[in-house]
Amino acid sequence: MNDLLTIGDKTFRSRLFTGTGKFPNASVMQKALIESGSELSTMALKRVEVNNPEDNILKPIVDAGINLLPNTSGAKNAREAIFAAQLAREALGTNWLKLEIHPDPKYLMPDPIETLTAAEELVKQGFIVLPYCHADPVLCKRLEEVGCAAVMPLGAPIGSNKGIVSRDFLEIIIDQARVPVVVDAGIGAPSHAALAMELGADAVLVNTAIAAARNPIAMATAFKLAVQSGRLAYENGLASVNTQAVASSPLTAFLD
């Protein structure tokens, strides 16, 4: 498919973005990321030795030719997130950033106020900001207005594998957005990813469902195909939903 996605200064063929946590080892992670076809992978700055080119998270991604998307997971407020972003840009040479601010370690819900504050400042500092946020149409619009390159509303809580529980709100966000919408968090099965794409999301980000699978490499293939299938379905028009039966072969003038 010649269906490209542009975010900021990069263009992607794959609409499956990936995470790097929870894999059994670096080798499996690299093979799964390559098999997924993903061209953008995120890693928590707190887990990476940014000054070590042999780091077992960073090196496999770089060697595979996948674009880096450092994230600020662990930041509890805007100040901490901005500081982490500046360190990442200096160490990794990228101004791309997945902005994550979740002060509650139990539920990892993103803080909307701190996220918006940090996003506005980081955009001013020249970052390409992709904020992880609630599936809140008003917040997503505000993040777009302050200059975020995309928005990343959650499908369900991080790591829950519950799927697209925020569907109604995601549909509004997708309808209103003038920047790409990347559904992030909660996607636990290829069918969830396909549904997000069928709704019109521009991309999805998947981590736990691939990394924690019995065979992460095979599961990466499943997600790759699901994202492609969902996007193809959206692009070509899904049949409308009806409240009553509609015959596929009407018996018009039968036996007249």
Swiss-Prot record:
GO terms for molecular function: thiazole synthase activity. GO terms for biological process: thiamine diphosphate biosynthetic process. It is found in: Cytoplasm. The active site is at K98 (schiff-base intermediate with dxp). It catalyses: [ThiS sulfur-carrier protein]-C-terminal-Gly-aminoethanethioate + 2-iminoacetate + 1-deoxy-D-xylulose 5-phosphate = [ThiS sulfur-carrier protein]-C-terminal Gly-Gly + 2-[(2R,5Z)-2-carboxy-4-methylthiazol-5(2H)-ylidene]ethyl phosphate + 2 H2O + H(+). Its EC number is 2.8.1.10. Pathway: Cofactor biosynthesis; thiamine diphosphate biosynthesis. It is an enzyme of class 2 (transferase). GO terms for cellular component: cytoplasm. Keywords: Cytoplasm, Schiff base, Thiamine biosynthesis, Transferase. Catalyzes the rearrangement of 1-deoxy-D-xylulose 5-phosphate (DXP) to produce the thiazole phosphate moiety of thiamine. Sulfur is provided by the thiocarboxylate moiety of the carrier protein ThiS. In vitro, sulfur can be provided by H(2)S. This is Thiazole synthase. The lineage of its organism: Bacteria, Pseudomonadati, Pseudomonadota, Gammaproteobacteria, Vibrionales. The gene is thiG.
